[in-house]
Amino acid sequence: IPEDIIKK
């Protein structure tokens, strides 16, 4: 999910 990329 896009939020996973933001977490990184």
From Swiss-Prot:
Subcellular location: Secreted
Signal peptide span: none
A GO cellular component annotation in the UniProt record: extracellular region
Tissue: Expressed by the venom gland.
Keywords: Cytolysis, Secreted
Coiled coil spans: none
Any one GO biological process: killing of cells of another organism
Function, as annotated: Causes weak hemolysis, mild mast cell degranulation, and small LDH release. Therefore, this peptide may be considered a weak cytolytic agent acting on mast cells, through two different mechanisms of interaction with the cells. The interaction with mast cells occurs through two different mechanisms: firstly, the peptide may bind to a G-protein coupled receptor (GPCR) related to the control of mast cell exocytosis, and secondly, it may cause a minor structural disorganization of the mast cell membrane. Does not have antimicrobial activity.
Protein name (record): Cryptide TyPep-9
Source species: Tityus serrulatus
Lineage of source species: Eukaryota, Metazoa, Ecdysozoa, Arthropoda, Chelicerata
